[in-house]
């Protein structure tokens, strides 16, 4: 989804967006998925299917069927820390959730839907489209 020939301006906008939205309830899951995609070039279908059992905390890596992805470089620290924060007792790193809004309190919360099912690839595509609109890309 991210073209290799993105202009530097677009890359900067996306990197700033990732930094700004990494703790935002609505965007944090997508932003982590996007960060993994930008580092690895993995297809969103593969990213949503990452299982927690394949995350090696000791070696700072994720084992995929045909690939081992290392997060051992110093500039990977923020991304790895976010992966560790996201990791849980669920089967998948990105399991099914929904956002519950409380307009009266101007508050939103990510609510678990199914710990045994991965987030759909459509979630990534939908949020990617929203991000492009927000950033005027």
Residues of each region from the PLM?
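Helix-turn-helix-type domain boundary/helix-start signal
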Residues: 4-5, 69-73, 135
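Residues in the recognition helix of alpha-helical DNA-binding motifs
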Residues: 50, 82, 86, 127, ...
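Short, basic (Lys/Arg/His-rich) helix/loop patches that form interaction surfaces
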Residues: 19-26, 40, 114, 122-137
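Basic, Lys/Arg- and aromatic-enriched nucleic-acid-binding interface segment
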Residues: 4, 8-44
């Amino acid at each position: 989804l991210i073209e290799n020939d993105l202009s530097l301006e677009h890359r900067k906008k996306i990197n700033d967006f990732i930094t700004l939205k990494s703790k935002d309830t609505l965007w944090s899951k997508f932003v982590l998925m996007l960060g993994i995609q930008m580092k690895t070039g993995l297809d969103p279908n593969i990213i949503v299917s990452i299982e927690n059992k394949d995350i090696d905390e000791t070696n700072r890596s994720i084992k995929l069927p045909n690939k081992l992805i290392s997060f051992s470089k110093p500039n990977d620290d923020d991304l790895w820390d976010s992966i560790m924060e996201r990791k849980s007792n669920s089967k998948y790193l990105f399991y099914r959730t929904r956002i519950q809004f409380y307009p009266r309190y101007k508050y939103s919360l990510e609510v678990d839907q199914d710990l045994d099912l991965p987030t759909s690839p459509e979630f990534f595509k939908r949020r990617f489209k929203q991000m492009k609109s927000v950033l005027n890309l």
